[in-house]
From Swiss-Prot:
Primary role: This protein is one of the early assembly proteins of the 50S ribosomal subunit, although it is not seen to bind rRNA by itself. It is important during the early stages of 50S assembly.
Domain of life of the native organism: Bacteria
NCBIfam families (alphabetical): rplM_bact (TIGR01066)
GO cellular component assignments: cytosolic large ribosomal subunit
Source organism: Bacillus mycoides (strain KBAB4) (Bacillus weihenstephanensis)
Protein name: Large ribosomal subunit protein uL13
A single BP term in Gene Ontology: negative regulation of translation
Similarity comment: family membership: Belongs to the universal ribosomal protein uL13 family.
Subunit structure: Part of the 50S ribosomal subunit.
The entry's keywords: Ribonucleoprotein, Ribosomal protein
Recorded GO MF terms: mRNA binding; structural constituent of ribosome
Entry keyword Ribosomal protein: yes
Length: 145
């Protein structure tokens, strides 16, 4: 009888990828990066095991949003004090917090639980073109489309 292959966490081979966000659309970049982090691009993908690779995103400050989202899209957060609802537009987020903007988009596409928290630790986002992960010899990942 044949059995379905199940990957084991200690047998997974992980690669490092660099993705340049300059001129890329936020959602299209985020879906592909979330898929890499999860390991869905591998034939050994197992839903309950972290089979994904590490991803480094550079030039987060140069991400592109379509339509009028720079002014219309609003990011909400709460200070946990009464009346503490704060809001920022996507333009404010891109100029002041570009790393957080990308992290929020990608983490929203990952599982909500222990596996999602473990997978999100393999995401490294940098606003500029420099990153401190040269020792890992990351490969440049070309996005589809």
């Amino acid at each position: 009888m044949r059995t379905t292959f199940m990957a084991k966490a200690n047998e997974v081979e992980r690669k490092w990828y660099v993705v340049d966000a300059e001129g890329q659309t936020l959602g299209r970049l985020s879906t592909e990066v979330a898929s890499i982090l999860r390991g869905k691009h591998k034939p050994t993908f197992t839903p309950h095991v972290d089979t994904g690779d590490h991803v480094i995103i550079i030039n987060a400050e140069k991400i592109h949003l379509t339509g009028n989202k720079l002014n219309d899209k609003i990011y909400y957060r709460h200070t946990n004090h009464p009346g503490g609802l704060k809001q920022r537009t996507a333009l404010e987020m891109r100029t002041n917090y570009p790393v957080q903007m990308l992290e929020l988009a990608i983490k929203g596409m990952l599982p909500k639980g222990r596996l999602g928290r473990q997978v999100s630790k393999k995401l490294n986002v940098y606003a500029g073109a420099e990153h401190p992960h040269q020792a890992q010899q990351p490969e440049v990942y070309e996005l589809r489309g």
